[in-house]
């Protein structure tokens, strides 16, 4: 098996666009910078990632429940959380090209390339577009929250924000969940949803966009146990990616330096994936933060509502600390695609070998679980194959393809990660059996048509 090293990220981006995983948003109008739509295969992969996260983090545990909070929250929420005052990035403009950049990103890229920070700051950084010695404006603070106005007139009273994270919708519902779900620490609240950030320099395909989806969970604990729980969730979340097929050597843990921690954090560790970006190949998949009691304390102070917890057994009242694993759905999407991409060889009908592109996605993530392929468009084969496809579709997402040579159809399915191909051939008319081909090893089993669903159920467990 050959995992191409060269610009695999570019190859995967092209594959994603060509096969309908991802489309540029509004493409017929020229597109929107760094905005993407998810096509038929992309939306299935996204849903499967979400399903696996939800099972692992929420429904697979007895100490976590789910929530779905509003995208537009009261403005006071963002004042209390600190986002109105501190959710800023340093913006600089090149005096050569007049393009704008995040100053910290320019400095980080320099450090990644040279192994040390620029001795003279921005003055040492060349213009990314032209390569000339850089000429930069003074950095200024740029608030990344997207504004909107509610009501018929754009007034200060109507000013609201599209949420830059899903977490705050969880914190403001802490007391509701404690009461209605009868939960007490240690317990968590999970949420998957859209967030919005007015990024200065979006890019790297779907890695950094202004509209994105998060998979976040806030885990509320006694303060004395916070460090232990923090390490637990770092280990748990790292293992989740490995269990779903990402190779360990392509993952690393990155500890935020104390001087770069967010205003709420005592310690943050990022799970990073080796995407292969220019400059620094590593990119954040997920941050796991010890947010201390900052969130519940600030919302209690600003709202006047008591958000502490009373421990009846020990007769003590405390404000819980929060451990937050916060994952980017579309970043996970990108990592799973890149890590699954392989090239190998498969035998052709002429006795030779052809190059084969395969997405070795875990079957639980694969957009299509099986493809039903009649050997030809024969009047007796197609109806039988369509009936089988309809039966299997009751359980899984199934493709039906009767166009072209069978070898070419296998390749089409391999390229999008379909784990199984079910071929209805002329022998099927006599023995009521089909050939089931497995994607990775290309092994084939003859299976009775009445047993195909059971055969797949064993091999698609957890899908």
Swiss-Prot record:
Residues engaged in binding substrate: 102, 165, 212-216, 324-328
Record GO cellular component, one term: extracellular exosome
Modified residues (N6-acetyllysine): 394
Highest taxon of source: Bacteria
Known function: Catalyzes the attachment of glycine to tRNA(Gly).
EC number(s) per entry: 6.1.1.14
Binding site for ATP: 197-199, 207-212, 284-285, 328-331
Catalytic reactions on record: tRNA(Gly) + glycine + ATP = glycyl-tRNA(Gly) + AMP + diphosphate
Subcellular location: Cytoplasm
Pfam families: HGTP_anticodon, tRNA-synt_2b
Biological process (GO), any one: glycyl-tRNA aminoacylation
Lineage summary: Bacteria, Bacillati, Actinomycetota, Actinomycetes, Mycobacteriales
Protein name (Swiss-Prot/TrEMBL): Glycine--tRNA ligase
CDD domains registered for this protein in UniProt: GlyRS-like_core, GlyRS_anticodon
Keywords: Acetylation, Aminoacyl-tRNA synthetase, ATP-binding, Cytoplasm, Ligase, Nucleotide-binding, Protein biosynthesis
InterPro entries: aa-tRNA-synt_IIb (IPR002314), aa-tRNA-synth_II (IPR006195), aa-tRNA-synth_II/BPL/LPL (IPR045864), Anticodon-bd (IPR004154), Anticodon-bd_dom_sf (IPR036621), Gly-tRNA_synthase/POLG2 (IPR027031), Gly_tRNA_ligase_bac (IPR022961), GlyRS-like_core (IPR033731)
Encoding gene, per UniProt annotation: glyQS
Gene3D superfamilies: Anticodon-binding domain (3.40.50.800), Bira Bifunctional Protein, Domain 2 (3.30.930.10)
Subunit and partners: Homodimer.
PANTHER family: DNA POLYMERASE SUBUNIT GAMMA-2, MITOCHONDRIAL, GLYCYL-TRNA SYNTHETASE/DNA POLYMERASE SUBUNIT GAMMA-2
Protein's UniProt keywords contain Protein biosynthesis: yes
Organism: Mycobacterium tuberculosis (strain ATCC 25618 / H37Rv)
